Amino acid sequence: MNLNRHYLLPLLIAMLLIPAQDLSAKKKKQVKEPTDRELWAGVLYRMAEPVLSNMSEGKLQQNMLVELSPTWDGRNKKVTYMECFGRLMAGLAPWISLPDDDTVEGAQRKQLREWALKSYAQAVSPESPDYLLWRKEGQTLVDAAYIAESFIRGYDALWVPLDSVTKQRYITEFTQLRRVDPPYTNWLLFSATVESFLCKAGAPSDTYRIASALRKVEEWYVGDGWYSDGPDFAFDYYNSFVLHPMYIEPLEIMTNAGKNKVWNMPDCDYNRAVKRMQRFGIILERFISPEGTLPIFGRSITYRTGTLQPLALLAWSCLLYTSPSPRDKRQ
């Protein structure tokens, strides 16, 4: 009897623990997984917070660690800060321009927008430690174009609220970039983007720089949604990084302004350009493997997280094609 009791007690304890452990496992399984939107909103915030929280206080250049490639070409390393800020804001602008709401995401957007507005001011204030490298370097044209693109995409939320001094400083900095003579590549569109933003903002703009760039890119269309990056076609992702977005956006601005009649350029048609970008979007969609990866080809492959920019623009503009379905592209 004593022997039975000796074994019975551990058995009873074990029987009591098993359901408890099982219940604990069920509770763990019931932890709410983030939605796709919550996941990507979190990624956006983690990318943007270190840059904008520092730059809003004029501390980006002080605190940002810069690593140079072993094949670095010797250019001024301060171009890094403009590249960092400009490309971040070009991608971030549509999201943080959404109306405020009471969600966690809404609070994140509001905070980033507040930091961004302060950072824009720091970028053009000669007294700021984070005054960007606007002068001398030719590379500045590239990254300034992404800042201009952020203003195009978030005009009411990011440009309009800036004070008059900051706005005039941007107009001055953008205007002096005409000193850069862009090569006959996608660089023509950097000039066109800057000048079309000036037009949108009501500042003096160089219409020739816009029109000549758009005409040249139109000449470079090779078919099936692809543009050549200059006279010779290159199989890379620059149709995603530059050619489609920075062809569509200036063309839309100038078409809405009625400027295409002034240019007498019926060859540059906005609706046709959209159809080409839709076709390119289908190709991009079919590049994606079942594992969610993209094929690696062409130069600047480290930028490949930007390869889906045309798809993002189409979705944002409600211009997504019907096959594959919009839901597939969101997934």
Regions found by a protein language model. Give the residues of each.
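Bacterial Sec-dependent N-terminal signal peptides
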Residues: 1-28
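Low-complexity, Ser/Thr/Pro/Gly-enriched N-terminal "stalk/linker" regions
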Residues: 26-84, 94, 114-118
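Aromatic-lined, polymer-binding surfaces characteristic
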Residues: 81-82, 92-95, 109-277, 286-312
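Loop/turn-rich, solvent-exposed surfaces of beta-rich toroidal or solenoidal domains
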Residues: 313-317
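Single conserved hydrophobic/aromatic residue that forms the stacking wall/gate
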Residues: 321-331
